[in-house]
Amino acid sequence: RLLRGRLESLIPAAYGKLARLAADFRSRVQHAVPEARRRAFWEDALQGAVAEDVLAGREAEGRARLEALLEAAGHAPDDAPGEVYLVGGGPGDPELLTFRALRLMQQADVVVYDRLISDGVLALVRRDAERIYVGKARAEHTLPQEEINALLVRLARAGRRVLRLKGGDPFIFGRGGEEIDTLMAEGIPFQVVPGITAASGCAAYAGIPLTHRDHAQSVTFVTGHPKRDGDLRLNWPALAMPNQTLVFYMGVHGIQAIRAGLLDHGMPPDTPVAIVERGTQPDMRTHVSTLAEVCALVERTEISPPALLIIGGVVTLRGRLDWRGQAAQRQAG
């Protein structure tokens, strides 16, 4: 009784009118809309302007809108493509997802996801959506990027709503631009939803502001993933300049080259360095060292990917700004 009362207080009574309207159209939709597109039709109808009209008491307008949607669906070609949602899944904590990301995750027919997607984020995808894992660990891609691009096109051409779920933000070292370039060339509809990039999420959870008036007037995001020959080919003189913060994505594997490049171009050996491991997730760890000693830290510490390097004076602020560590101490005390 308590649960029923709670639900009745949360669900507007007008939803009954919306349900009756859907029932009136059910058999017509079954005849006019192919089965592969039927769920998408109802979701578009019942989450958009039709629902808004009915819930606002404009039942006649809602019925007219649904008639128009059904008419358009009946004239759509059978081979019309579906749509691809390129969604940033953030750094790992599912509570950092955007509202739009969560909505599209619940609408998708199939999800294509990478290694960097946490279990907590993946659990929020529609339960009956097909799941396709494409890997993309360092040097161990379950599918090469070109095959991932082709997979997205193939799934969308089958009329499916494809969730391309990527860790962090798809446009920051996520190769999202390459994927939508292919979709554009193939005439596949798509939309892009940004996510919180690892630099922002990891730094915030570690208590390290990326900029600070006393320490850094700029921040630079850098890929730490070396080329096949082991060379990073970066602008080391610019990166070694003072009063800035450097964030290296995928930097642990190339830590020796990063250390050498910065030291060789004048960065002080005592420059603070933080390695944030599995940032924003329950098993997150933060290791603090200096540029001179960071390689030794990596050698003696088993660091699990994903891990992020933060280099600069802002790292010294962690001692007093580690809000999560302080909260844990208060709870323990």
What are these regions (language model features)?
Residues 129-136, 187-191, 210-220, 266-275:
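Short hydrophobic/aromatic-enriched beta-strand-loop microsegments
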Residues 86-96, 139, 226-227:
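Short, glycine-rich nucleotide/cofactor-binding loops
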Residues 1-20, 197-201, 207, 306-307:
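Short alpha-helices
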Residues 169-242, 282-289:
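Class I SAM-dependent methyltransferase SAM-binding "motif I" and its flanking Rossmann-like core
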Residues 1-9, 24-27, 31, 94, ...:
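Adenine nucleotide-associated cytosolic modules
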Residues 4-7, 99-107, 125-130, 178-182, ...:
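Short, solvent-exposed amphipathic alpha-helical segments in soluble enzyme
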Residues 72-73, 80-88, 106-196, 201, ...:
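Class I S-adenosyl-L-methionine
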Residues 20-78, 82-84, 158-162, 216-218, ...:
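A contiguous loop/helix-start segment that scaffolds small-molecule binding in enzyme catalytic cores
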